[in-house]
Amino acid sequence: MVRFIFVTGGVVSSLGKGITAASLAMLLQAKGFRVSVRKLDPYLNVDPGTMNPHEHGEVYVTDDGAETDLDLGHYERFTGVTACKCDNITTGAIYSKLLKDERLGNYTGITVQVIPHVTNIIKDFIMSNTNGFDFIICEIGGTVGDIEGLPFFEAIRQIGNKLKNANCLFIHLTLLPYVKTARELKTKPTQHSVKELRAIGISPNILVCRAERNISKSAIDKIALFCNIKPEYVIPAIDQKNIYLVPIAYHNSGLENKVLNFFNINVVPSKLDKWYDIIDKIKDSNSKVKIAIITKYHKTQDAYKSVIEALNHAGIYYKYKIDVLWINAENLTEENINKKLLDINGILVPGGFGVRATQGKMIAIKYARTNNIPFFGICFGMQLATIEIAQNLIGIQDAVTEEFKIKGTKIIEKINKNCEDATIKIKNAHISKCTYSEAFECDASTVYTNIHEDSNNLSTDKLQIETNFRNMSDIEKTMRLGAYPCNLVANTIAANAYKSLEINERHRHRYKFNNEFQNIFEQHGVVFSGFSQNKQIVEIIELPELRWFVGVQFHPEFKSKPFEAHPLFIQFIKATIEYNKSNEQQ
């Protein structure tokens, strides 16, 4: 029988509900249980794909092409379980489905209301696709008291009433603010948060209290008394220097054992060797390298969350600390770049969209290329690298990308329908796992076929959804989302890094390198080391005569994990370490 665990938050947002849910999932896995983690977001956007990264952070892309909340990245990195679109839902997706069903007459003329119709969709989402799991952990976005979150809280309240304590547990994460003048942690906000939660019919079974310092026994007893919870079920969540220390901190507090005790499940020893190994490497990391990330969305680091973590994973691999220097590309010029990038060991240009800040990024790419500094370009970063090479190395002064809609030689062009299934979203998920959530993006014009990217190689493990193009915008038609296979060229940087000639990586782009220019690029030393299966889309470029200069069309950061760093990030950090050592010897 599957058991449901709901993680809610109070007092303030950004307390770490996603890290808590991911940590608990990992700790239960370490005891041999099968766990799925899901995120329910109350905002009205259908998905975060069109949201400003300054507001929402990065868009995390799953294998099956879903644009999801960045917390799914935490779930994958902590548990190693591949997420899919059925692990994330929003109010926008719910209302989109509900209104389509109403227009199609599926509600047979009755009055459609928040209760029961919206809440029923939420409950169906939570309780679907549970086969094969011992626990389903659901994180509810936002904080208790938010008006947009009320249908979600009502839905999980109803689930709790139906399943009772034997199969349902509520974890509430709150903040204990430290008041310097009083020299103590204040419990009153937590008390009021629990009061708010209980007012809508949910009594938390476990309280996780976030604090910047240790919580005294008297404070825990006070929280337990006023929140009607046993003291042993008040779990401290003390700030950690590294997020990968959080799971072990929860383990030391007995979080997973408290969960098992609540469900009357026998507690068995945990297998946490790989996590202790990670912690040892983090603590042994005394040396560091300095990486400049050339950003467009500079106001929040969450816009590049997976990139940061992938760098850290490679740092853990080599027992090196990664010192990230955030560079606002809009402020980067030929005149100030020497000063701004002083003493850096590597340059990374991540993905992005639009013309803003591109000039600064290209200046950084030129600086890396001409000064032989390790460079890594991801998605748009690779595209800009080809434009910089065209302009400054090959001599195509008017080289541009079609995305900017300006006159010039289009080195980067829009993906078209001839580019190997690039006009639709490939669904690479486990088909049996995603049966319910497909209803949120399919309508009567949708046709399902089981097909591989190569039409001559049928495969039942991939789901291709071909949607009526008349109902799609031009942007939707050309977006290439999700995991696609890629063939590598032997004896290249990429092939040596992966130790394989066939890989599978996640994509999120609607433009590609113009293959008409491949020959002239090769004549100037560029190696095209990765292609889509029919060679229509360039996936990887290299400048092998330099220390390390690689651009990739995909997003390798989405597949990196603390215990399995991505091979390209490993090689990039290796190059920065060697570059740093060579500078120290001079």
UniProtKB/Swiss-Prot annotation:
Q: Which region ranges are annotated with the description Amidoligase domain?
A: 1-265
Write out the residues that bind CTP. S13, D146, I147, E148, K186, T187, K188, P189, T190, Q191, K222
Which reaction is recorded as catalysed by this protein?
UTP + L-glutamine + ATP + H2O = CTP + L-glutamate + ADP + phosphate + 2 H(+); L-glutamine + H2O = L-glutamate + NH4(+); UTP + NH4(+) + ATP = CTP + ADP + phosphate + 2 H(+)
Q: What GO molecular functions are on record for this protein?
A: ATP binding; CTP synthase activity; glutaminase activity; identical protein binding; metal ion binding
The source's domain of life comes to: Bacteria
State the active site: C379 (nucleophile), H555, E557
Give every Glutamine amidotransferase type-1 domain span: 290-582
Q: Which Gene3D superfamilies match?
A: 3.40.50.880, P-loop containing nucleotide triphosphate hydrolases (3.40.50.300)
Subunit organization = Homotetramer.
- State where UTP binds: S13, K186, T187, K188, P189, T190, Q191, K222
Q: What is this protein called?
A: CTP synthase
